[in-house]
């Protein structure tokens, strides 16, 4: 019996779907994380209301936050300030947000070396403060002339040195994928995880950002599962305008939270966003929303 190419492809697709679709018994036997995931909220220092660091910490603690995320620029000179401010509190440094000089995958050696020196200085401070890691974007639009292949090759070459410095300091490099309007390089969590796999160093990890993921990831769940154990930090914002979670219509994070629960995520979800209203009202409202959605995930 003759089979047309169209029929052959259709039958093949049906067979593949049947073969790859998990049965009920298979679904019940999916591996469970070594420990249940926790919802630990953090907020960037610049997002939290308050005129002083103490006022910001007081506000965050009063609303159930466990972490604060400072900017990396100037952090080496603020280590003692943070140590004193955090003494006797339950809140801690979650991660450190960038703030380094130079461009890590610049085509210019002197620009790369400037980035390496600056990143190491901030990593030392991040480690002293017990931060999960330092967020690193390899390059934004217009910061490098290297193509994707050369840029990736260079990044994989440079990261072991930075990862070793981070590991000795007690922290990590956190590679952050961005959306296509901000960079052409490194836009999905799976790509960042693949770089971590190739580098194979405990000092090199990944972070995800719900805002960037809105534009780049087909599935929040799949993105977090793909990142797996490499995922060590998460940013969150409203999904249309990058404001407080809940300030945009349809802000929903349940799919991603299911992914975080699936991998047993233990670290922070940190607010990196603006606010349409008074943050003293919008932040508590966002916290309530996230706790509700976490429970539903």
Where does each model-flagged region fall?
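Structural motif corresponding to the early beta-alpha repeats
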Residues: 47, 66, 70-163, 242-244, ...
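Histidine-acidic metal/acid-base catalytic patches
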Residues: 2-42, 51-61, 131-132, 186-208, ...
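Active-site acidic/histidine proton-transfer and metal-coordination neighborhood
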Residues: 7-20, 28, 33-36, 105, ...
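Residue-level signal for pocket-adjacent positions within structured domains
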Residues: 42-43, 99-100, 180, 239-240
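Conserved dinucleotide-binding and phosphotransfer motif residues
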Residues: 63, 89, 169
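Hydrophobic anchor at the start of a short beta-strand
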Residues: 41, 93, 173
